[in-house]
Amino acid sequence: MKVKIINKSNNPLPKYSTIGSSGMDLRAYTENDITLKPLERTLIPTGIYISIPEGYEIQIRPRSGLSIKHGITLINCVGTIDSDYRGEIKIPVVNLSNEEYTISTGDRICQMILQKYENIEFAEVEVLDETDRNDGGFGHTGY
């Protein structure tokens, strides 16, 4: 699928790392290094602007290696960029480690995944269909 992109950074365009990759890494684009203290959070600019096709969203997800090795992850776990957004993609990160971590231009900071979605049209009713589970919630299937 062809998707329009503006790259105002000096980083390469996002690309798939392997033939089976579902996500592309996004890279930081900053004038100066950004050092995050423990539990500090900030928005990391990418210099990337994307025209997302209608009926799709871009999901922003943490990079597993960055999370497990350095405690750097996304504030909202999975972020959504809507198809009508045209601003710069900025990544909300948090340092969950006990050590400072520095992010520099070109560092891979998250993954983006293009995802199709359907809009919901609610049909208001008085009763929902029954299932084997019904209203069994947290812990219902065991711990």
Swiss-Prot record:
It comes from the Bacteria. Its EC number is 3.6.1.23. It catalyses: dUTP + H2O = dUMP + diphosphate + H(+). The keyword Metal-binding applies. Pathway: Pyrimidine metabolism; dUMP biosynthesis; dUMP from dCTP (dUTP route): step 2/2. The keyword Metal-binding applies. It is an enzyme of class 3 (hydrolase). GO terms for biological process: dUMP biosynthetic process; dUTP catabolic process. Substrate binds at R63, S64, G65, N76, T80, I81, D82, K90. InterPro entries: dUTPase (IPR008181), dUTPase-like (IPR029054), dUTPase-like_sf (IPR036157), dUTPase_trimeric (IPR033704). GO terms for molecular function: dUTP diphosphatase activity; magnesium ion binding. Its cofactor is Mg(2+). Keywords: Hydrolase, Magnesium, Metal-binding, Nucleotide metabolism. Gene3D superfamilies: 2.70.40.10. NCBIfam families: dut, PRK00601.1. Belongs to the dUTPase family. HAMAP family: dUTPase_bact. This enzyme is involved in nucleotide metabolism: it produces dUMP, the immediate precursor of thymidine nucleotides and it decreases the intracellular concentration of dUTP so that uracil cannot be incorporated into DNA. This is Deoxyuridine 5'-triphosphate nucleotidohydrolase. It comes from Finegoldia magna (strain ATCC 29328 / DSM 20472 / WAL 2508).
